[in-house]
Design a protein with these regions (language model features):
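Non-catalytic beta/alpha edge segments that cap or flank active sites
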Residues: 1-204
Length: 204
């Protein structure tokens, strides 16, 4: 879902990377890329240019793909898959290898959210880093878990109980010099300090 180019919101380029040996070789259908594209399209007002990649669990390939997407101007890069303790799970190592700064709070919050659902969340090793002017975040491998960690936990009436990690993404991207991301509150309300909130632009 991409809004019209006449939108009053800043355009953003987002890299989405699904990491799976079997999906990348056609053994089964990849569900990570569609889940990421669907959620982001519903969560953001901004016009989005997606840069999708489906790659195997190879550390060098993952690192090279992340660097490629950063160099291509992606302000945000989200990965899915390869963050567990299995021998082939190397996404965190590949991500840290290209980092200029680590952002440990994202991984900590994702594990706290997932622990509300499954005790095995403590086996997750997701990390987040900044490289140049890009924020790179590892997400879980399952579409349901992707949505839960991005959105957080809500009660039956839709009130936020535990913030999802995406609430902090727009302000982080502000701080590293990226576009001004604006979220749909019903999906995920972005948090910014009052002095960082931009007045609405007039529609073109």
């Amino acid at each position: 879902m991409t809004e019209a180019v006449t939108s009053s919101h800043d355009a953003v380029k987002i890299g989405i990377v699904s990491i799976s040996d079997r999906a990348s070789t056609g053994v089964y259908e990849d569900k990570g890329l569609p889940a990421l594209q669907d959620w982001l399209g519903r969560a953001l007002h901004n016009p989005i240019q997606f840069e999708p990649r489906l790659i195997p669990d190879e550390q060098a390939t993952i690192s090279a793909t992340l660097i490629e997407l950063v160099n291509a101007g992606c302000s945000l890069v989200l990965t899915t898959g390869g963050t567990g303790p299995a021998l082939r799970d190397v996404t965190p190592e590949a991500t840290l290898a290209v980092a200029h700064k680590e952002m440990p709070g994202f991984g900590e919050q994702m594990r706290q959210i997932s622990l509300k659902f499954v005790p095995t969340a403590i086996l997750s090793r997701q990390v987040a880093v900044v490289r140049e002017q890009s924020l790179i975040i590892n997400l879980p491998g399952q579409p349901k878990a992707i949505a839960e960690t991005l959105e957080g936990l809500k009660d039956a009436a839709g009130a936020q109980l535990v913030p999802g990690i995406f609430a902090a993404v727009p302000y982080c991207i502000d701080l590293i010099g990226g576009p001004y991301l604006e979220t749909r509150d019903e999906m995920c309300k972005a948090f910014r300090p009052k002095n960082a909130i931009r007045a609405p632009k007039a529609a073109l």
